[in-house]
Structures are given as C-alpha cells and as structure tokens.
Amino acid sequence: MQPVLSAEQREIMRCACRSERELAIMDLLYSSGGRVSEICQLNIADMDFINRRARIYGKGRKEREIYFSAQASLHIRDYLKTRTDDNPALLVGVKTPCRRLTIAGIQWILKNIQNRDERLRGLKISPHTFRRSCGTDMLNRGAPVEMVKEKLGHAKADTTLQCYAKISTEAVRDAERRFGAA
C-alpha cells in the first residue's frame, strides 16, 4: 500500500511553507484530490471561488469538476494577489517570464518544503501522496466509495478501493464497535 500523510504530517508541511503559492499548492492538491497533471493545467478562469470548484480535464480529456476547501480557496486567492504577471495559468514559476508550473516543478516545490522539517525526512512525499491521502481520509471518515470515486475521477469503484482504501486501525476499531457482530 502506498503511503498517505497523516493530518499531523500535512500540518507540519503547511507550517514549513514559506509562501502563499506553496500553501495554495498543498491545500489544492489535498482538498481537491486532483491529479497533479490536472492541477498544472488549471487556468485562473477555470476557478469558481464562490462555489469552491474548478473545471478540469482529466484522463482521456474528460471534463469534470473538482472541489476544494475554503482554506485552499483563501490561499489561492492570496497567492493570486501576489502575482504581477498576466499568465492565464493558475500556478506559475517565480522566475520571469512566469511560466506555467509543470509536474516536475510541483514535485520540486514539495520536496523543498519537506526538506525544511526533519520530521518529514525519509517520507516518500509526492503530489500523488496528497491525492491518495484525500481519498483515504474520505473513506476513513465514512464517505461512500461511489462519492470518493467521483471526487477522484475514477472510472471504476474498484480502482478507488484498491488504491485508496488504506483503512486506519482506529477506523476498523470504530467500525467493529458500530457494526460488529459482538
């Protein structure tokens, strides 16, 4: 089973962020559950901050919506206020001319954030770790598999269960208390 980040590890990473852009990237990756390729393709015009959703093009160029948290919305809007360029991309590099961030660029940013706190050293953290953490956390909180499947843009619920259902010991214990035969 691939690793997921605990709430504490995500908070440690958030505290290690040094810019609104870094916070926006982390919060958007986790709260939306979007693929890093989908996040990189986002334009500012795709964002609906009132309803906290964005239009993306997923695998197979299928259009769908992703939803993001109020926290992500706040950090994205604060990040956009710091920008002085006219690039339509949501996430851009800091060097002029500001170009759309790539998958490798986001990986590099996350690795730098991770390296700022020794408690995160040795963990395998990638953009996909945030997606996996989002799906796993939703399942652990009792979200129906079908809902998680839709959020993550999976074609089949089997994919969701196989890749994201790392159920915590506490969740198993709670389920046994609530639904067990005892």
Say what each PLM segment does:
Residues 1-182:
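Conserved catalytic core of the tyrosine transesterase superfamily
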